[in-house]
Amino acid sequence: MRQIVLALALCLAATAAFAQPAPPPADGGAAQAPAAGQPPADATQPAPTPQAVAPAPTNPPMTGPRLLISTSMGDITLQLDSVRAPKTVANVLRYVKEKHYDNTAFYRVAKGFVIQMGSFDAKGKPHGIHPGPVPLEADNGLSNLRGTVAMARADAPDSATAEFFINLDDNVRLNHAADDPGNTTGYAVFGQVTSGMDVVDAIGNVPVGDNGPMPGQAPVTPIVVKKVTLLK
């Protein structure tokens, strides 16, 4: 009887030993491969479903005149779109021909958002005369993407005059609202930077302060717009 009990005890001890999990490798190495016929651990999980990557938003090619903005930090070339924004482009060209933009400044630098010019000189004083506003052309199929140029305006839709801004990022929230049946929302894109985006980014990163028409967004050192020229 004692032999049977002893044999049973030895059998239970052996079973318990095999039931204990193997300790992890002392050197922190990789776990051992699964036993023959057993799948790898991650094979028991469903494979991830490939996700379609949305293409980056783009604007259609723009057709129209070009402008050269000569600033104290370098030159910026704009391609305007007189097909999709004819009234806006004609309005801006009028100011260019009248030399309205000469000796003004990029007076607003909203980091990661926009840089803006058109109505103030380097001292932050109002510059020039605005003959009248231009009708809003935001519903023209052009989006406020990085490097695009759009008209600044007041709350009223048809209130843009001389001021415009360059987008430092994709600011699609500034676009015409899809559920707006008329041209009453958004900011009208009328051009695109084709050269000098490095200058735009440099302007967008200058130190700013409160000494200007846009407190907290006024360049500490004025960014002078020496001249805006219509290119042939």
Language model region names:
Residues 10:
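Cytosolic-facing loops and C-terminal tails of multi-pass membrane proteins
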